[in-house]
Amino acid sequence: MKIGMITDSLGALSFDELLDTVADLGIERLEFAGGNWSQAPHLALDRMLDSAPARQEFLAKLDDHGISISALNCSGNPLHPGAIGERHREVTRKTIALAGLIGVERVVMMRVVRVDRATPMPIG
């Protein structure tokens, strides 16, 4: 068994500090958030999509620390109507595209469905 965590739980750390910390703790797998409800503190989604060298550097740093990616996460509300939903759908599409580019087979997401207009929904 390998122990993992989502990187948002150490969101105040830089990417390099995150890697040092989790390696010191014996954590071997990380789930990186690409956006939506997360601020994505450790994954520059657009930069990674646009730059093969950025992807290679990211993966090399993980490898140098003995860490692999368990999943990318894009939890949000892509079913929300209007601009919020469109923004979340865009991040979802980009996260899935990045997963393909870096060989990650798992993308974590959740959907939120409004039961009725009186029910408040989380938005971000």
Label every PLM stretch briefly.
Residues 67-69:
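N-terminal glycine-rich cofactor-binding segment that shapes the pocket for flavin-like pterin cofactors
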Residues 13:
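Residues that form or flank phosphate/diphosphate-binding pockets in enzymes
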Residues 17, 55-57, 61-64, 78-124:
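Active-site acidic/histidine proton-transfer and metal-coordination neighborhood
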Residues 1-4:
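Extreme N-terminal starter segment of soluble prokaryotic enzymes
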Residues 31, 71-73, 108:
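Conserved beta-strand positions in the central sheet of alpha/beta enzyme cores
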Residues 16-38, 98-106:
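Catalytic domains of carbohydrate-active enzymes, especially glycoside hydrolases
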Residues 6-10, 33-37, 74-77, 112-114:
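Active-site beta-loop-alpha junctions enriched in small/polar residues
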Residues 33, 41-63:
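Glycine-rich, positively charged N-terminal anion/phosphate-binding segment
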